[in-house]
Regions:
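Small/aliphatic-rich secondary-structure junction motif
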Residues: 1-51, 133
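Glycine-rich, Arg-bearing micro-motifs that act as flexible, cationic patches
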Residues: 109-132, 147
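General small-molecule cofactor/ligand-binding pocket signal
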Residues: 34-36, 83-87, 139
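Short, flexible loop segments at boundaries between secondary-structure elements
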Residues: 136-147
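Structural beta-alpha unit
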Residues: 73-107, 145-147
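Residues in the short beta-alpha loop(s) of Rossmann-like NAD(P)-binding domains
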Residues: 39-41, 112, 144
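Short, hinge-like loop/turn segments at secondary-structure boundaries
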Residues: 50-54, 101-103, 125-127
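A short acidic, glycine-rich active-site loop
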Residues: 52-66
Length: 147
């Protein structure tokens, strides 16, 4: 049984699937559970001077705080004792950093599975990249493409 779990949550359908699947697994409710939402700043948002206005950063942090609060509430309704964490940065780096810092034994993420190879290649995958850097086991909840 896992004693400490980190769930990465971004509010997408796949993220919600991951929350539900983890909540339904026997024994997860007894684990020390942490929910992480990461406010990311896409490179397209950077201005020509190479920085982001503070207002844009604050907007993204506020948006992700709402997503985090939603996820924490959903898990608490299912009987979890959960601690929420908000980070700013690249999702892979922040997920791995917090998992190491907390000594997690499992990371739970959602993943949108594309049907076409070109779509998978173009978008990349947090789940696949996470496999290369995670300090512990990973549970990937799959959300299949409806196209």
């Amino acid at each position: 049984m896992y004693r400490r779990i980190l769930m990465a949550y971004n509010g997408t359908r796949e993220g919600k699937t991951a929350l539900v699947e983890a909540a339904e697994m026997t024994g997860f409710a007894q684990a020390e559970t942490h929910l992480l939402s990461v406010a990311t700043m896409p490179s397209s948002m950077f201005l020509t001077e190479g920085f982001l206005p503070e207002e844009l950063i604050d907007e993204e942090k506020n948006r992700m705080q709402e997503v985090l609060d939603e996820g924490v509430s959903a898990l608490r309704e299912k009987g979890f004792s959960v601690t929420g964490h908000l980070a700013v940065g690249e999702p892979i780096e922040e997920i791995c950093r917090l998992a190491r810092e907390l000594g997690c034994e499992l990371i739970v993420v959602g993943h949108h599975q594309e049907k076409s190879f070109a779509a998978r290649w173009w978008k990349g995958s947090i789940g696949a990249t996470l496999l290369d850097y995670a300090p512990c086991s990973i549970l990937v909840a799959i959300g299949r493409s409806t196209r």
